[in-house]
Structures are given as C-alpha cells and as structure tokens.
Swiss-Prot record:
Its EC number is 7.1.2.2. PROSITE patterns: ATPASE_ALPHA_BETA. It is a peripheral membrane protein. This is ATP synthase subunit beta. One of its GO terms (cellular component) is plasma membrane. Produces ATP from ADP in the presence of a proton gradient across the membrane. The catalytic sites are hosted primarily by the beta subunits. GO terms for molecular function: ATP binding; ATP hydrolysis activity; proton-transporting ATP synthase activity, rotational mechanism. Keywords: ATP synthesis, ATP-binding, Cell inner membrane, Cell membrane, CF(1), Hydrogen ion transport, Ion transport, Membrane, Nucleotide-binding, Translocase, Transport. Transmembrane segments: none annotated. Belongs to the ATPase alpha/beta chains family. Coiled coil: none annotated. The lineage of its organism: Bacteria, Pseudomonadati, Pseudomonadota, Gammaproteobacteria, Vibrionales. Gene3D superfamilies: 2.40.10.170, Bovine Mitochondrial F1-atpase, Atp Synthase Beta Chain, Chain D, domain 3, P-loop containing nucleotide triphosphate hydrolases.
Amino acid sequence: MTTGKIVQIIGAVVDVEFPQGEVPRVYDALNVVDAQERLVLEVQQQIGGGVVRCIVMGSSDGLRRGLTVENTGAPISVPVGTKTLGRIMNVLGDAIDECGDIDAEEHYAIHREAPSYEEQSNSTELLETGVKVIDLVCPFAKGGKIGLFGGAGVGKTVNMMELINNIALQHSGLSVFAGVGERTREGNDFYFEMQEAGVVNIEKPEESKVAMVYGQMNEPPGNRLRVALTGLTMAERFRDEGRDVLLFVDNIYRYTLAGTEVSALLGRMPSAVGYQPTLAEEMGVLQERITSTKQGSITSVQAVYVPADDLTDPSPATTFAHLDATVVLNRNIAAMGLYPAIDPLDSTSRQLDPLVVGQEHYDVARGVQSTLQRYKELKDIIAILGMDELSEEDKQVVSRARKIEKFLTQPYHVAEVFTGDPGIYVPLKDTLAGFKGLLAGDYDDVPEQAFMYCGKIEDALEKAKKL
C-alpha cells in the first residue's frame, strides 16, 4: 500500500503528493492516516509531478500539510445486499443510525459501468400511483425514470413521500432512498414514517423493505456529489438479483450543485450560469446507470429543484433529456390552493400513447388537456370583458374546466397530519370514469365546489348533496 503526503488544502479539495511511479488512478480512494476520525479522499485529477487532486468525503477541518495518506488501490466501495435494509448509511456506506455496524458479505465499488445495450430491457407495463392527475396525464412505466420538477416550496418532497406511500407500500419489492443535499429533518421524518408503516423494522432489519443513504445539506460537497452513486449502487445490486427496485432520489439538483461547488476548486472553467463544464457528462454517468435489465428493473423517482422557477436553467434542462415522465409542479396552481400543484398541461409522459394506455385513456387525457388549454386562452378575455361576453359554447368550456381543475385535487395520506382530511388512493378506472363524465357534460349541474379534494366522482356527488 503506497503512501503520500498532503501538500495543499483548498476547502473541499486536497492535493496529495506520491512517489513518481506509484501515483493513484483517478477515482481511487485514499485514507488519511492521522485524521481524528475516518476520512476518505477520492482522486479526481493527476496534475503531474506525482501530485493528485482529490475531493474530501467529509469535513476538511483539522487537516494540515504533511499528513500521511494511504492509497487503497480501489474506488470507494459500499456494503450491498439485504444487510443494508432498514439501515441509514452515509456516502461511504457506514451506518449512521446508531444500530451497530453493517456486516455485509459483499461490497460494490460506487463507480461502475452502465449496462450494455444487449442487457437493457424496456417495459410498457404501467405503474398505478393512485394520484389522479399523474395516472391520467403522465402515467408512469414500471422500470421508467420519473422527474418531479418544481421551485422552492411547491410540494416536491410531499409528492415524493405520497408516491413512496402509494407505490412502495402497495408494491412488495424493495426501495432505496437517497437523500442528496436535502434537509436532515425530512430524512428524519421519512425514517420514522417508514417505521410506523412497517417498511422499516428495527427489531428485525432483514424484514425491512427500504435502505436509506443520506448526504444532507450540512455535509461537505464531496458527500453530496457521491451519495447518489452510493444509493444507486445498492439499488443495482438488488436489480441484479432479479428484483424490481424503486429508487427515490431527493434532490437531483443538489447533486449538480455539489459538482458546481468543487468544479472551480478543481480548476475547471465554469460554463453557462456558472455550472461545471462537465454538467451533461456528470448527469449522464448517473442517469445511464439507472436502467432496467433483463434480470430486474429499477423504477426511479427523482425530485428536481428548479432554480427561480426557470425550467430552461441548465441543470433541470439537462435532467429532462433522461426522463420517461416529467411531473411539473406549478407555483400558480399552489397559490390557488389546489394541491397536488401538478400542471396537467406541462407534465408529460412517453407512456401516454394509445398503443400503451389504450384509446379510451388517451382520448380522456387529451380531452382534459384541450379543455384546460382553451380555458387558459379564455382567461385574458374574461379578465377584460367578463364572462357575459363569451359564447354559450365557451361558457360551457369554462364551467367544465373549472370543475376539472378542482377534480384534479385530492387529499394525500402523508398530508393528513396537517390537513385533517384522510388520504385517498384512486384506482385508474375510477379516475377515467370521473373525467370522462365531466367531459361528456354528465355533471354540468353539479356545483364546482363539490369537486374540491375528493377521490372518486361518487364522492363529489355525495358532497354536492350536502352543499
């Protein structure tokens, strides 16, 4: 095992000098020998003259020049397999839940090749979420990649928690949750909610259904940059065993941001909006590995923060290209008090095709979108001239669109605590029946307020009797 010496420390980036013939390879893990606690460096560049530039996987406080560093000769490797279930780990795969060490038989390196074309498989099997607006307008595919796009405070994490609740609890498979640069409180809430739901079993961890990997907001950029790969590596191991895995990543934007933080320190010229020049490649390396093979599938749900609500920002724009379904959250819908604040006109899915979802579903979804689009166009006229100036046909469109907007809302299980309304899971056939009736004009005489926060159309009719 070769050793070197620290020669320079710039925040999260450290230069280490090795003897000329024994320079570590890029992505090799190095251990700092004299550090108070375990500290790992990951090689990013070979500068020349035996010096390598590394990212610190932890806090660089207390490091000084001249400390001895050992080369492990291999990339960072993390525990994989059933021993990780029910546990909370950090970027290095060390347990941080105070329930003892993880004695896994197998460890995988976090840097791995994406599956080849021959190994990949594509599926058109739909994944029902029980959320009306998603199942109708942007249906998810089993083994697909889903992105939840939204600015600050419009409900990305709540929507993700509801999807975990509806999919992970109904689906008997395993899940991996990667918390990338998000609030520690949310990770804590998630852990305790999973315990209450029986998905995490502290007494018998091997009976748990979820593994959690956290690198939160307060962590150095090295942790946030690599923690998504740690979670993905664990999910890949379950997939290769022939299981169907759910991978939840909250938040993919922080992964990009961590790359931006270290990029300048590594001496790269910034590109558009100050992002790293390697943005597309870094995103591709992660996303290409999140895929389904002939052995098993990985269905991933990723929250994507949209800076300043600008979907053309390079980070969300780069993410768009990799996804099968995009769920776009809209601040204006949230401001109207309509939750989930998912925009049915902006959200898209490759599965919304008559050959996949069937002609009836396709027609209902497009009918809902065209009604809402027409209402959007008429809003300016209504604002200036009022409703009275519209033709009878347009008045009918406006009335139906307002009912559709209200009927797209529904109470969430995870929001019960602060709304007081019990959550509702709506099967797809009930969703289609409700919207089909609304488009056909079967409920033109029902007051629009009856459609707010109800599940099936029958619930709305019950509510209307009480109004």
